[in-house]
């Protein structure tokens, strides 16, 4: 009996391995959190397996190499960026190397955080505020500060504007806040240096912050930023209508994938589907 059971188990295992080997591979570049985590979640991988595919997720430490790796065919797709970032990449390369944002998956809201304050009502005049030092993210930070009533911004400024602290006049900043421009990825670790800081969703998650719990304020999920800065899966134009991309889209936009994002990231990752 034991020999028969062992043979049955061996047969089941061999069939399972054979089935796994039959799955077609989709190689996707991603940053660690939350992108690679989402791709490697049971919600996504199980659905892909049903559709006949499995993922080879290549984790990158930074953004610089991810788009070129898709352009040159090293990776089949990537998942780490919003459309404005992709547009800026496409503007720097030959047409043959340009990529397409095939579909959006999620949005990472900016939040206002503090190491010392429990609410924005505690913020004193003249306080120090850390903001990202790159144009698109500093714009988002200043617009969020305006949305919660701490400052005002030039008339007509919106999600597609480019703003820096130098655009905020004394009249727009009657409480005399002092803005410190810092590399976005450093803001979580330097949070104790400021009274408040405006931090990207992915960097907040990396630092162990829970946006829905720890943020003093968050960008509205129905804001223009939620559309403009939704994170997309990027591919070569020739792959837009491929079967493997359709399978990847299906797997990333199921109700199970939505539930995983909502349960795991506490408001730091908002599904856009």
Language model segments and positions:
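A bilobed periplasmic-binding-protein/Venus flytrap-type ligand-binding module shared by bacterial periplasmic
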Residues: 108-120, 228-242
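Short, well-ordered beta-strand elements
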Residues: 22-33, 53-59, 128-129
């Amino acid at each position: 009996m034991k020999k028969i059971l062992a043979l049955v188990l061996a047969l089941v295992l061999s069939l399972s391995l054979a089935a796994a080997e039959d799955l077609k591979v989709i190689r996707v570049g991603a940053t660690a959190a939350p992108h690679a985590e989402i791709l490697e979640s049971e919600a996504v991988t199980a659905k892909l397996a049903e559709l006949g595919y499995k993922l080879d997720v290549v984790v990158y430490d930074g953004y610089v190499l991810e788009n070129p790796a898709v352009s040159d065919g090293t990776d089949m797709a990537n998942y780490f960026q919003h459309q404005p970032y992709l547009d800026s990449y496409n503007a720097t390369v030959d047409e043959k190397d340009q990529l397409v944002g095939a579909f959006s998956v999620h949005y990472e809201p900016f939040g206002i955080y503090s190491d010392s304050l429990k609410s924005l009502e505690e913020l004193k005049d003249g306080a120090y505020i850390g903001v990202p030092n790159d144009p698109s993210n500093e714009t988002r930070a200043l617009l969020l500060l305006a949305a919660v009533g701490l400052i005002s911004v030039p008339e007509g400024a919106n999600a597609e504007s480019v703003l820096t602290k130098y655009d905020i006049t004394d009249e727009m900043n009657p409480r005399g806040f002092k803005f410190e421009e810092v590399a976005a990825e450093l803001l979580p670790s330097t949070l104790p240096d400021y009274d408040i800081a405006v931090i990207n969703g992915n960097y907040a998650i990396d630092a162990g912050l829970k946006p829905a719990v720890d943020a003093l304020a968050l960008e509205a999920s129905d804001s223009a930023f939620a559309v403009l800065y939704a994170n997309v899966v990027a591919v070569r134009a020739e792959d837009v209508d491929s079967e493997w991309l359709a399978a990847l889209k299906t797997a990333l936009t199921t109700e199970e994938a939505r539930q995983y994002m909502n349960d795991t990231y506490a408001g730091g990752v908002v599904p856009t589907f």
